[in-house]
């Protein structure tokens, strides 16, 4: 539920103000109040705690003054379970460096929250500012998508693109208390037509075989982009994804025609990466797991259906090896250098009024199953995540 707020943003010395915007809390398992406890706000003596914020500048007033540089929504995310203050920043940066233009834009920022009536604002420290995936996201990439007037779905847990499994799955709009498996984010057709299009894709994936499937995949999907996207996804150790856990992605069809479209997978939610490993799906080690068997292909068939063809598989394997080659963007020395440069920029600002997350540490999430992984403190071949992942890729 949104509440009214005013927003002030400073970008490279230039200030922007939006009055009467909307703000709400965001997150699934990570959603919590910005103030500890269940009571009302404690004036000038609040027990602040980190949480995620979603801003909608045009929630209440829909005019051009309620945008900032053409943007009307913004997602501010705290570095939950990421003492390294870099996992999602690194992930989207790597996507973009590798030519995956469907990856959202993000950056570091500093956040203050001022509750009306309090003497001073609370400093929340260093946050991650994320672009939201919506109609504005599509418009900014319309030349590459071919059209921004198609159908955009947010795929929540259980979205397998498996026709037999998902033909009766929930598809529609979220009502705030319930999120369907396939959640409408932006559609330019009626819901029935959008559903037919989504089910057509799944059914084609199930029914077509051999050369007919190969050719349809090449026509319906930007195969090179898709496989480079998935190469980055696997290099990052993203186990909570489509292939392994039927979770955390968007899909976009660039037309409203139920049978004639281009399908795009948009990567999403990359904080549990880079050595934050977990016993999930077919995996128990996100560093060493076989990149060709990343998930259960019977449950989530799309990637395996593509990789069964030698020419498509070569694109994927070549992309993985390009990433971790000595000249690649995932090579451990280059990756460590980028992370250290970011830390030099933000290090003086992480101490904050919540008292949480006040030190940068090279540790994966405490609930993970491989606590030995490191990003920059060690370059050991058995514990440095970049080197462990590269070794797994070189076996292909």
Where are these regions (language model features)?
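A short glycine-rich, hydrophobically flanked beta-strand micro-motif that places a catalytic Asp/Glu
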Residues: 2, 104-111, 245-251
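Metal-dependent nuclease catalytic cores in nucleic-acid-processing enzymes
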Residues: 89-99
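Short, solvent-exposed loop/turn and secondary-structure capping segments
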Residues: 19-20, 31-42, 65-68, 87-89, ...
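Short, solvent-exposed loop/turn segments that connect beta-strands within catalytic domains
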Residues: 12-16, 115-122, 256-261
């Amino acid at each position: 539920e949104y509440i009214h707020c005013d927003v002030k943003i400073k970008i490279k010395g230039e200030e922007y103000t939006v009055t009467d915007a909307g703000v709400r809390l965001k997150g699934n398992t990570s959603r919590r109040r910005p103030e500890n406890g269940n009571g009302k706000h404690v004036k000038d003596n609040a027990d602040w705690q980190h949480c995620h914020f979603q801003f909608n500048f045009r929630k209440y007033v829909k005019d051009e003054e309620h945008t900032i540089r053409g943007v009307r929504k913004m997602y501010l995310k705290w570095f939950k379970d990421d003492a390294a203050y870099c996992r999602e920043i690194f992930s989207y940066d790597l996507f973009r460096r590798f030519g995956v233009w469907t990856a959202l834009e993000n950056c570091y920022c500093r956040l203050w929250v001022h509750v009306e009536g309090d003497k001073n604002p609370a400093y929340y420290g260093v946050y991650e500012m994320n672009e939201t995936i919506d109609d504005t996201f599509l418009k900014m990439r319309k030349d590459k998508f071919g059209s921004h007037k198609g159908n955009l779905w947010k795929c929540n847990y259980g979205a397998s693109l498996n026709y037999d499994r998902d033909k009766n799955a929930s598809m529609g709009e979220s009502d705030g208390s319930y999120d369907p498996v396939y959640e409408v984010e932006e559609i330019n057709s009626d819901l029935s037509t959008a559903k037919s299009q989504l089910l057509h894709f799944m059914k084609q994936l199930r029914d077509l075989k051999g050369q007919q499937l190969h050719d349809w995949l090449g026509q319906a999907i930007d195969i090179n982009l898709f496989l480079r996207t998935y190469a980055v996804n696997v290099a990052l150790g993203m186990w909570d994804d489509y292939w392994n856990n039927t979770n955390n992605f968007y899909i976009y069809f660039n037309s409203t025609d139920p049978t004639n479209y281009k399908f795009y997978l948009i990567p999403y939610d990359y904080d549990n990466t880079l050595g934050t490993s977990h016993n999930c799906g077919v995996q128990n080690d996100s560093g060493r797991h076989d990149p060709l068997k990343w998930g259960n292909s019977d449950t989530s068939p799309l990637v395996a259906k593509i990789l069964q063809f030698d020419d498509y598989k070569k694109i994927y394997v070549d992309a993985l090896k390009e990433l971790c080659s000595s000249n690649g963007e995932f090579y451990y020395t280059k990756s460590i250098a980028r992370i250290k440069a970011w830390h030099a920029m933000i290090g003086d600002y992480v101490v904050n009024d919540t008292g949480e997350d006040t030190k940068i540490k090279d540790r994966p999430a405490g609930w993970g199953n491989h606590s030995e992984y490191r990003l920059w403190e060690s370059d050991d071949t058995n514990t440095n995540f970049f080197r462990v992942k590269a070794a797994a890729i070189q076996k292909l």
